[in-house]
Amino acid sequence: MTFMQQLQEAGERFRCINGLLWVVFGLGVLKCTTLSLRFLALIFDLFLLPAVNFDKYGAKTGKYCAITGASDGIGKEFARQMAKRGFNLVLISRTQSKLEALQKELEDQHHVVVKILAIDIAEDKESNYESIKELCAQLPITVLVNNVGQSHSIPVPFLETEEKELRNIITINNTATLLITQIIAPKIVETVKAENKKSGTRGLILTMGSFGGLIPTPLLATYSGSKSFLQGWSNSLAGELSKDAIDVELIISYLVTSSMSKIRRSSLMIPNPQQFVKSTLRSVGRRCGSQERYATMTPYWAHAVYQFVITETFGVYSKIVNSINYSFHKSIRIRALKKAARQVKKE
């Protein structure tokens, strides 16, 4: 091979390497650009865009919002803030006395109509769903909030999970949510169709998701799976109902002070129900921390930033995140078992 041929061959190799470097550079620029755009969208959604106007969902026009799990925590706060926006309410929960007290509070303060239904969804009886159907039959419903949910009493290995607890979680989080939506969503479609000719009213279905569904959660395996299921179901429903002018959103939350989380004091990362619901209702239709997900929102700012960081670094399905999650819930389990042992000794 002559010297000139060697130079030509080296030039060809250099062009290949140079081309490869340009491809890598281009991919890097694309990644940085999309990351920057998602971060800007996060900031706009959380802090800069104005609050959503619920007039488009029929606020102050006699329309109804149905809420499950409405007697405590997040559900109770949804009822208060939707009543404040001028919606009549259908409140579905387990405890009659709590529902009656909330009914009186909201009717006195906001002068709205509040209908209540006390049923135990964990029983999964056909009569429960018939009662819901009868109550909602003649009501112009435009909003449904699927809030009812159940978790484990304490973190527990899947192989040690009691069958009753497992069945309750699936029944409440999945079966009941789907069946209630099948009952109420047609009413929303009907109401929106009638109103669209006059005012362009839209419908809205909100379903409570969880970080437990976003990130696989060892020691809460059944709960984690049930919430992950809701992600796929809610996104699919959003695609089906978009043609009917109904917005369907999954709401992702980290910890919130409530009886289910067993956390009493709020903090930077853990809002109270009032703070969480306020951030949710002001951001309906915006992704906030769920920039990579369709028809999904993580509305509370600290939760949103936390999700953004995990998603853009390790990834929600990575081994390291799974391991950290396992260690976190293992420590909670150990503390809970020690507390239970101390209580037994006192007795």
UniProtKB/Swiss-Prot annotation:
Catalyzed reactions: a very-long-chain (3R)-3-hydroxyacyl-CoA + NADP(+) = a very-long-chain 3-oxoacyl-CoA + NADPH + H(+); 3-oxooctadecanoyl-CoA + NADPH + H(+) = (3R)-hydroxyoctadecanoyl-CoA + NADP(+); 3-oxoeicosanoyl-CoA + NADPH + H(+) = (3R)-hydroxyeicosanoyl-CoA + NADP(+); 3-oxodocosanoyl-CoA + NADPH + H(+) = (3R)-hydroxydocosanoyl-CoA + NADP(+)
GO MF assignments: ketoreductase activity; very-long-chain 3-oxoacyl-CoA reductase activity
Root EC class: oxidoreductase
Pathway: Lipid metabolism; fatty acid biosynthesis
Residues annotated to bind NADP(+): D120, N147, Y223, K227, V256, S258
Subcellular location per the Swiss-Prot or TrEMBL entry: Endoplasmic reticulum membrane
Membrane topology term: Single-pass membrane protein
E.C. designation(s): 1.1.1.330
Pfam families given in the database record: adh_short
Cited CDD domains: 17beta-HSD1_like_SDR_c (cd05356)
One GO biological process term: sphingolipid biosynthetic process
UniProt entry tagged with the keyword Lyase: no
Catalytic center residues: Y223 (proton donor), K227 (lowers pka of active site tyr)
Residues that span the membrane, as ranges: 20-40
InterPro entries: 3_ketoreductase_fungal, NAD(P)-bd_dom_sf, Sc_DH/Rdtase_CS, SDR_fam
Record GO cellular component, one term: endoplasmic reticulum membrane
Assigned keywords, A-Z: Endoplasmic reticulum, Fatty acid biosynthesis, Fatty acid metabolism, Lipid biosynthesis, Lipid metabolism, Membrane, NADP, Oxidoreductase, Transmembrane, Transmembrane helix
Function: Component of the microsomal membrane bound fatty acid elongation system, which produces the 26-carbon very long-chain fatty acids (VLCFA) from palmitate. Catalyzes the reduction of the 3-ketoacyl-CoA intermediate that is formed in each cycle of fatty acid elongation. VLCFAs serve as precursors for ceramide and sphingolipids.
HAMAP family with a match to the protein in the record: 3_ketoreductase
Recorded family membership: Belongs to the short-chain dehydrogenases/reductases (SDR) family.
Misc remark: Present with 41900 molecules/cell in log phase SD medium.
Subunit structure: Interacts with the fatty acid elongation system components ELO3 and TSC13.
Entry protein name: Very-long-chain 3-oxoacyl-CoA reductase
Native organism: Saccharomyces cerevisiae (strain ATCC 204508 / S288c) (Baker's yeast)
Source organism phylogeny: Eukaryota, Fungi, Dikarya, Ascomycota, Saccharomycotina
